[in-house]
Design a protein with these regions (language model features):
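Charged phosphate-binding loop/patch that engages nucleotide di/tri-phosphates or the phosphate backbone
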Residues: 5, 191-222
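Short, electropositive alpha-helical surface patch
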Residues: 164-189
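Acidic-basic catalytic patches of nuclease active cores, encompassing PD-(D/E)XK
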Residues: 1-50, 58-60, 222
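Compact nucleic-acid interaction/catalytic patches
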Residues: 73-93, 119-134
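Nucleic-acid nuclease catalytic cores
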Residues: 139-173
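Conserved catalytic cores of phosphodiester-cleaving nucleases, focusing on short active-site segments
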Residues: 54-75, 96, 100-108, 112-119
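Basic/aromatic recognition patch in beta-strand/loop cores that engages polyanionic ligands
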Residues: 45-53, 57, 140-142, 148
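Short connector loops at helix/strand junctions that flank enzyme active sites
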Residues: 49-51, 62-66, 136, 147-149
């Protein structure tokens, strides 16, 4: 596929359009579904928040994938540093371990201290999810991959350059997030990952008649 960059238009609701166009781009042999903001069933085991933007199941290959879709009019997509997220996990675990050892009697005089600590942990959690790529999504999608061996992806589209990429979440973590001191990922980063065969370019085509984009995404389910 190719794209006519001069003809492509950007709308105020570009993020929603990207999600709709991406879903509609899968072939007829692929079931694609956009789950509601909070998942039920299997998804509820991992989070009360949105796990992903899109699920796709290929009836020929019998493969299911989960995708988190990120779009931007800027030049990069933000993510909180790995060290910050691990610090949250450390503080949370230390408190939970300590709290598990307490009894109703020992907790009584520590009521305010416990309340203050819970508030601190809540703020740390909010901080890890204050970027475009949220920590809880990375963590939960990694758990899905680990427990069910389901491929999970983050897809990025950059409207100004009309370039779109996809990277498996575990590759994003191991080949970028853990080893960078940056607070965002840009096209140069993604191009390098593609060059190293750690991410994918998503070919796309802009259809002027409908003002929609079509993405070549079937291969992600193969």
């Amino acid at each position: 596929m190719s794209i006519d960059k001069k003809e492509q238009r950007v709308f105020k609701n570009n993020g929603k359009r990207f999600e709709e166009d991406f879903k509609a781009s899968f072939g007829n042999h692929i079931w694609a579904y956009r789950p509601p903001d909070s998942g039920g069933g299997m998804m509820a085991r991992f989070t009360h928040e949105s796990l992903c933007d899109l699920m796709a199941y290929n009836i020929k290959t019998k493969k299911l994938i989960l995708l988190e879709l990120k779009s931007t009019l800027g030049t990069s997509v933000s993510v909180r540093p790995y060290e910050q997220c691990m610090e949250y996990e450390k503080v949370k675990k230390e408190f939970e371990d300590w709290n598990a050892e307490q009894t109703a009697e020992t907790r009584k005089p520590l009521k305010e201290k416990i309340k203050k600590k819970k508030k601190e942990i809540k703020e740390l959690y909010k901080g890890t999810n204050s970027a475009m790529i949220k920590y809880h999504q990375i963590k939960d999608l990694l758990e899905v991959k680990k427990e069910y061996d389901i491929k999970t992806f983050i897809a990025f589209t950059f409207f100004k350059t009309t370039n779109t990429y996809a990277i498996e979440v575990d590759s994003f973590v191991e080949n970028f997030w853990k080893i960078t001191d940056k607070k965002s990922i840009n096209e140069k980063d993604l191009d390098k990952l593609v060059e190293n065969k750690q991410a994918y370019i998503i070919p796309q085509e802009y259809i002027r008649r409908t003002m929609k984009s079509k993405y070549d995404v079937d291969f992600l389910t193969e």
